[in-house]
Amino acid sequence: MTDNDRKINQLRAKIPTFRCIKGCHDCCGPVTVSSEEMARLPVKSNAEHDAALNELSCAYLGAHGCEIYDQRPLICRLFGTTPSLLCPNGQRPEYMIDVKVEREIHAFLGATRQVLL
């Protein structure tokens, strides 16, 4: 396990969780993720990525929601947990993410090689 893999795991543990509304995919748009996070995910074809991008969607959004929910990237986990990425349906954790943790996540994302999900 690399230092970045350990850091990803550490940061994930600090992000609060909440229950999404079934069928909502508002957070499932095209985003960039660290190459380390991308390496954890099943490989999608270029055609699958292109089709999703044409719909301004995520290649991992399936008919029943996120196909990679347990391995979803940090940016996906942040959605709805911070005032800067509020859920438009009003869903949120009991306590929003600590501002220091959010800054730490953004610093990590800024310091790592980003690729389009």
Which residues fall in each region the model found?
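Short loop/turn segments that flank or connect secondary-structure elements
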Residues: 1-117
